[in-house]
């Protein structure tokens, strides 16, 4: 049995929590000298972290039942599990596109044309004119999201600003400490959340980059 086959089997057992103490020690010693197996371990960990992080995203009601009804009857096998470990990045991308696109499209469609604001602090909202005003002297702690309005910042936002179908006016430079993103189409909306979600996934996977963790 080759190095790749033997130690990838050990990696699979380690990820599933089925490896013995002797096998874990053998694997750790091998990973110190084998870059290929170490990279494979990192890829599998990233897939696990990705799926765990995406567990809060829900598909539309009845989605699972409709899919199961159309599936052909077949004996249960471990082919998907093997394929997932062989192509972890492809599986991660497929899961992300399916769940996130469905959820984000639903969120985008439900926004309507009303002016809405997400954030903490004293913000003035005028539904008729569509103006959202951060008054002079007011400091918004955290991120601010404005939908279908015109954001006028006379105070300060200590965080990021997301404008969805909105425009902005800054009374003074530096009034926003974070980034300002404008989203005016559904593809921009999906791309914004894609970047935000993948950033979280990378942060989680970086924390788990050691086999002994």
Swiss-Prot record:
Signal peptide: none annotated. One of its GO terms (molecular function) is metal ion binding. Is processed by three successive proteolytic events. First, the extracellular region of RsiW is cleaved by PrsW (Site-1 cleavage) in response to cell envelope stresses. Next, it undergoes cleavage at an intramembrane site (Site-2 cleavage) mediated by RasP. This cleavage uncovers a cryptic proteolytic tag with conserved alanine residues in the transmembrane segment, that is recognized mainly by the ClpXP protease, which completely degrades the protein in the cytoplasm and leads to the induction of the sigma-W-controlled genes. Zn(2+) binds at residues 30, 34, 37. One of its GO terms (cellular component) is membrane. Is the anti-sigma factor for SigW. The presence of RsiW leads to the inactivation of SigW, and its proteolytic destruction to sigma-W activation. This is Anti-sigma-W factor RsiW.
């Amino acid at each position: 049995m080759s190095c790749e086959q033997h130690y990838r089997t050990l990696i699979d057992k380690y990820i599933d929590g089925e490896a013995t103490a002797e096998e874990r020690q053998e694997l750790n010693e091998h990973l110190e000298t084998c870059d290929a197996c170490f990279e494979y371990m990192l890829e599998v960990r990233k897939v696990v972290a990705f799926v765990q992080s995406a567990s809060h995203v829900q598909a539309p009601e009845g989605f699972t039942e409709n899919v199961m009804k159309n599936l052909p009857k077949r004996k249960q096998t471990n082919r998907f599990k093997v394929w997932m470990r062989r192509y972890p990045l492809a599986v991660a991308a497929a899961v992300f596109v399916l769940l996130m696109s469905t959820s984000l499209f639903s969120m985008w469609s439900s926004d309507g044309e009303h002016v809405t604001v997400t954030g903490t602090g004293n913000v003035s909202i005028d539904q008729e004119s569509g103006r959202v005003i951060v008054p002079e002297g007011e400091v918004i702690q955290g991120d601010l999201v404005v939908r279908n309005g015109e954001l006028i910042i006379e105070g300060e936002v200590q965080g990021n600003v997301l404008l969805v179908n909105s425009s902005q006016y800054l009374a003074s430079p530096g009034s926003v400490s974070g980034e300002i993103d404008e989203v005016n189409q559904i593809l921009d909306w999906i791309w914004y959340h894609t970047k935000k979600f993948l950033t979280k996934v990378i942060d989680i996977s970086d924390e788990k980059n050691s086999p002994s963790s």
